[in-house]
Design a protein with these regions (language model features):
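A conserved, well-ordered hydrophobic junction motif at loop->secondary-structure transitions
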Residues: 19-31
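HotDog/MaoC-like acyl-thioester-processing domains
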Residues: 5-10, 65-66, 77-161
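N-terminal hydrophobic or amphipathic segments with adjacent small-residue motifs
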Residues: 17, 21-22, 61, 111
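Short secondary-structure boundary/capping segments within folded domains
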Residues: 1-2, 30
Length: 161
């Protein structure tokens, strides 16, 4: 099988052990799955183990119900020297009614690590399709926004001391 190294799809059945007090799937369980999917996508692309640097724009659009299939559609959007932005779209499917819903989206930045647990270089991502190019350009903007936000937070921290 010839799977693209920059994409990954994973489907998981939502079981009763994942519910919150409202009977829906607990957001924390979804966050853990998002991190696992981002790890799998980024590490396969990089050929190295990775660690999570940041989780951006996690948007829970609709509740997820027990018994639904949750499909995670992950793709590498951008690479830095050692970092990889992975975008994930989450689709929920009701097995009985066949209703499919877009329930979550987010972006995770992962950093590739060498055997000495130091950041290591990753292959440059070169978008090919129009969708990949759009996601690549949006990832550059998000990266710039993260840097700007970090600078603002640092100014706030320094002014408090």
């Amino acid at each position: 099988m010839n799977l693209p190294a920059h994409q990954l799809t994973m489907t998981v059945l939502m079981t009763p052990d994942k519910t919150n007090f409202f009977g829906n799937v607990h957001g924390g369980d979804v966050l853990k799955l998002l991190d696992q999917v981002a790890y799998a996508c980024a590490s396969r692309y990089a050929g190295h183990h990775v660690v999570t640097l940041s989780v951006d724009q996690v948007t829970f659009k609709q509740p997820i119900h027990v018994g639904e299939l949750l499909t995670f559609l992950a793709s590498v959007n951008y690479t830095g020297t050692s970092s990889i932005e992975v975008g994930i779209k989450v689709i929920s499917e009701n097995i009985l009614s066949r209703v499919v819903r877009h329930v979550n989206s987010c972006f995770l930045t992962m950093v590739a690590m060498d055997a000495d647990r130091k950041p290591t270089a990753v292959p440059k991502f070169n978008p090919i399709t129009p969708d990949e190019t759009r996601r690549y350009e949006a990832a550059i903007l998000r990266r710039e926004m993260r840097k700007e936000l970090e600078e603002r937070f640092n100014k706030i921290r320094l002014s408090k001391t």
